[in-house]
Structure formats: structure tokens, C-alpha cells
């Protein structure tokens, strides 16, 4: 990496919009993202949807002017802490830049934003077979959620609508 910078995206900026679409689609094409392009209808709705969502936060990593990584996050709320939290919904780095610290830079920026907002924690989900991402998250301090009587592994479930 020459000169990677991470910024909070301005989703009204055309360059940032292009970078978001490029990076999310690159993630979708990756085996960890499903292995195929996003449908054009999704691409058509993505930026407007993120802009309309009241708690979306998007961070972009650039190597000079080239987009190389993205973190798409949403601010939530912890009822047990009565404070906001940030969920890292998508974190992706283009294949040619993996293992070079881009993911860590994105997480550092997300963490800084969380501290700025007074968040109690960061959350994320990761595929069971995505060992590289798991190593990054563990090195960054992510772990199983604490419970009264020790550590408990949580499930992340979904139901299509």
C-alpha cells in the first residue's frame, strides 16, 4: 500500500457513490460475498437506500484515488447499556489489497466514530468459513459476547421477507 486513507463517505458525492457501488459489488463477486454481481436493481437502489437510512455510516479506504476497502455500518442501540452501538454490516477489501492493513484501518476509523458517538460497543457478524476475517477481528479485539456466567457464543439468524 502506498498511501491508504480512510474517510467517512459523503453519499451525496458522486465519487463516493461510485466507490461504494464498486466496492460493494466487488465484495458481492467474492466467494465470501456470494460469488456473483449484485443485481442491477440492487445497484440502482443502493445509494438512495443508504442515504435514506437514518443511521447509516459508510467508510471508504482509498489508495491514492483508488477505492480499496469499505465498511458499511449502522448505528443501533443497546438496551442493556442504554447507549448507542455500531454494527459493522459489511467490511470488505479488494483482493489485491488484502493482508496489507486496509481492514484494520477501516476498523480503527469505525472504532473512532463509535467513541465519538459515545457507543458502548461495536458488533459484527462473520461467516464461519471466513478465517482471514475472523483473525482480523480477533486481533482487533472482537470476541464472543460476555454473559453473566462466562462467554457465550451468539447466533446471527435471518428470515427473508
Model-found features: residue ranges?
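C-terminal "cap" of GNAT-fold acetyltransferases
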Residues: 3-5, 13, 118-161
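Short coil/turn motifs at secondary-structure junctions
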Residues: 76-78, 96, 129-131
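Acetyl-CoA-dependent GNAT
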Residues: 2-83, 89, 107, 113, ...
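Short coil/turn segments at alpha/beta junctions that flank glycine-rich nucleotide-binding fingerprints
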Residues: 84, 100, 116-120
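Conserved acyl-CoA
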Residues: 94, 105-121
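Conserved acetyl-CoA-binding loop-helix of GNAT-fold acetyltransferases
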Residues: 99-112, 135-139
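Structural detector for helix-capping/boundary residues
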Residues: 89-91, 140
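A short, internal acetyl-CoA/4′-phosphopantetheine-binding micro-motif in the GNAT/acyltransferase core
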Residues: 91-98, 127
